[in-house]
């Protein structure tokens, strides 16, 4: 356990150093299957927010750190950092449909955002996910991701994305993931994200 804690701390320090000058939007970056009970997960995902209306695209980093509470429930902390924007949150995911080759889950959580220059917000996150495994070690997943935000001393807005992605098992404790978030309204920005998730197996 001490070794696991040291690895987690090292990963957290690396993430902090990597994004110290970058300021995020949440990413899905997991299939409908929850983290195995008792296992820890650390995922780090370089992410690009695609520019809109001729604007420049922006690179940043997203991360997820989670724990499998039961065979069907996990909890994950989330963070993301882009220029001028920092995002921190957490959610609980429930794996409610376990089929032979089809799974579905739902997640509910919340977040806060810190915008440089004002406009800080907080909100509720909701996601619905489904996944299937066409071949060994490869999962195809898709999700609907919604965020309902309230701006401090301001109004409300909603972020909405359809998210197709892949999760490939490199080894028992390492997954490669890639996804695209397709914006569904004017408040949202489409994004692309890719990275690795490491599992600290119990």
Features from the language model and the residues they span:
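Generic N-terminal leader/processing signal
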Residues: 1-2, 39, 76, 177
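Cleavable N-terminal export/targeting peptides
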Residues: 1-34
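Enrichment for repetitive, rod-forming helical segments
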Residues: 9-11, 71, 176
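Outer-membrane beta-barrel transmembrane domain signature
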Residues: 26-35, 39-56, 67-68, 96, ...
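Short, surface-exposed coil-to-beta transition loops
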Residues: 59-62, 86-89, 124-125, 161
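Transmembrane beta-barrel domains of bacterial outer-membrane proteins
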Residues: 62-81, 87-93
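A short, polar/proline- and glycine-enriched secondary-structure boundary/capping micro-motif
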Residues: 86-90, 187-190
